[in-house]
């Protein structure tokens, strides 16, 4: 017969084996397969990347102690660099060393290069919108307009990849203007208040900037709601670019009644000095005020007001901070009414478009690298789209109105050559297929303020 001692040893062995199996199962459960959205590869990584060892603290009392990962640091970094921004941010709380690595500028720059390459295969759009003024309010009182929603949309699937709501310290009085994306960052400001921010929606980081002199002047001239209604068109949009450092550029027309002030003024924000400065040499042409400047290939571009019946394009070299006038623009653009034309960046190239008032056909031209000639790349014919495809839009905006002189704004080009379109008066965003001449609804948020081509990044604390 089995003695009591043998029975006790047998039970202890079984208990030990059971604990070992549980430990192995627990270790396997801690390892997860994280799918990188950027390149579609499956990366096996541990959320903690640490080995657990136990140090005995007396009989029957053990304390769990974490030891660093056995993987080399450079291997761990390469894994982290290919994870989505949200996953990387979560890893910061697991290790002081990882937090230091992830928050370093070198890591942010390396991650930026990877996501820039992946944007071709996985194009995305950022949608910025206000919250309804009474949503979540107390006592039916309007909530302050300090909340802005940011939603990232996948162009191919039209699905929402992420959404976040950021509350800013100072409100915008429902006059929100946003720049194009620069390395995943946006500049958001208002002319009715002195609010101006640089924000990274992916990391939720933002920085409030001192108001530009132009903002201060506008608030002095138009301090109330009544006076703002009578305001003449002004330049509402900044350009957010990166040379050696990040820059905000604000070009606007001077007071036409005072010729001693010059024709235009240009303010540039220096992030290191935390201050605005004037450029001494500015264009001798007044720029068309109601436009969004386009930035690509190291330059920022603006339309001018018509001179002798002809529109010109001025450009600022963001490295040398010098202005130039393009030698030639498309004749159809040059002789147009400024309200009928638009400028944008598509596939890293400067593009211009014009909408014909009688046919509503909109043609898009791209500037060649020599800057002396243009090529037609797309034609948008919304009137030829079937009425059934147009009837699905319920926001009250008619994309084929004959009296709508402003053209649609191309936001991005999908991999299947479909064109993503927005309009300053529309809340929704549509996708136009030039092959079969059809349109489909992509996204319709409430109180949308801006659509912009976008990719997530870790760049913060600039």
Curated annotation (Swiss-Prot):
PROSITE patterns: FBOX
Disulfide bonds: none
Source organism of the structure: Arabidopsis thaliana
Ranges annotated as biased composition (Basic residues): 28-40
Stretches for region Disordered: 1-59
Pfam families assigned: Beta-prop_KIB1-4, F-box
Basic and acidic residues composition bias: residue spans: 1-22
Protein's recorded name: Putative F-box protein At1g12855
Phylogenetic classification of the source organism: Eukaryota, Viridiplantae, Streptophyta, Embryophyta, Tracheophyta
């Amino acid at each position: 017969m089995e003695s009591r001692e043998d029975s006790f040893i047998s039970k202890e062995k079984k208990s030990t084996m059971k604990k070992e199996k549980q430990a192995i199962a627990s270790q396997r459960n801690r390892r997860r397969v994280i799918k990188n959205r950027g390149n579609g590869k499956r990366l096996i990584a541990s959320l903690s990347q640490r080995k657990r060892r136990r140090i005995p603290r007396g009989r029957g009392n053990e304390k769990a102690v974490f030891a660093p990962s056995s993987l080399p640091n450079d291997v761990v970094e390469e894994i982290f660099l290919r994870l989505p921004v949200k996953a990387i941010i979560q890893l910061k709380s697991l290790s002081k060393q990882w937090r230091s690595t992830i928050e370093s500028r070198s890591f942010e720059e390396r991650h930026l290069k990877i996501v820039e390459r992946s944007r071709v295969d996985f194009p995305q759009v950022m949608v910025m919108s206000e919250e309804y003024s009474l949503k979540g309010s107390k006592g039916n009182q309007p909530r302050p307009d300090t909340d802005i929603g940011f939603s990232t949309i996948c162009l191919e699937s039209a699905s929402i990849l992420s959404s976040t709501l950021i509350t800013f310290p100072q409100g915008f009085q429902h006059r929100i203007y946003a720049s194009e994306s620069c390395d995943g960052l946006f500049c958001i400001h208002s002319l009715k208040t002195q609010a101006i921010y640089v924000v990274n929606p992916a990391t939720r980081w933002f920085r409030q900037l001192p108001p530009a002199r132009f903002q201060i002047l506008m608030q002095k001239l138009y301090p109330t709601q009544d006076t703002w209604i009578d305001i003449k068109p002004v330049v509402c949009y900044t350009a957010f670019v990166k040379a050696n450092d990040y820059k905000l550029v604000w070009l606007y027309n001077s007071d036409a009644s005072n010729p001693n002030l010059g024709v235009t003024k240009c303010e540039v924000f220096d992030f290191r000095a935390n201050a605005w400065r004037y450029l001494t040499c500015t264009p001798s042409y007044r720029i068309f005020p109601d436009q969004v400047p386009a930035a690509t290939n190291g330059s920022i571009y603006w339309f001018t007001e018509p001179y002798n019946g002809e529109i010109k394009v001025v450009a600022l070299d963001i490295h040398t901070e010098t202005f130039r006038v393009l030698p030639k623009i498309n004749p159809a653009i040059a002789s147009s009414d400024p309200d009928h034309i638009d400028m944008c960046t598509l596939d890293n190239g400067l593009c211009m478009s014009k909408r014909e008032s009688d046919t509503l056909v909109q043609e898009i031209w791209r500037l060649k690298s020599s800057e002396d000639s243009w090529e037609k790349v797309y034609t948008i014919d919304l009137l030829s789209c079937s009425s059934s495809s147009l009837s699905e839009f319920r926001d009250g905006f008619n994309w084929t109105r004959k009296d709508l002189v402003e053209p649609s704004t191309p936001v991005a080009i999908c991999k299947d050559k479909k064109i993503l379109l927005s309009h300053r008066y529309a809340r929704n965003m549509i996708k136009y297929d030039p092959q079969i001449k059809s349109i489909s609804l992509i996204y319709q948020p409430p109180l949308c303020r801006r659509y912009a081509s976008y990719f997530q990044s870790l760049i913060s604390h600039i």
